[in-house]
């Protein structure tokens, strides 16, 4: 259970960094070779060196971000940690109205040198009921 507890604690720290709009703190959890599929991008973003400036720019353009995981699940398989679930992602841009989108997410972590590092993240917007 210690690995799952450590993984969950790491994920909670990731969520807190996102909600503070703190790209430096968030990127401290990333592996150098992270691959990200943000919910609003059709393309993958590869590597910490590429993703960090994008996160900084995104956070700089927002007054507030609220990433609220809904019943996240954690699983550990060897040195791989998986966190998945749904979230309400609320953003208030500096130049526009607040919006909320509902997203399903998967965070993949690898245990490297005793620490969980985010190696992949995927978020996809849930379809709206029409």
For each feature predicted by the language model, list its residue ranges:
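Residue-level signal for short segments within beta-strands and strand-turn junctions
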Residues: 38, 91, 110-111
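Short beta-strand edge/turn micro-motifs at domain boundaries
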Residues: 102-129
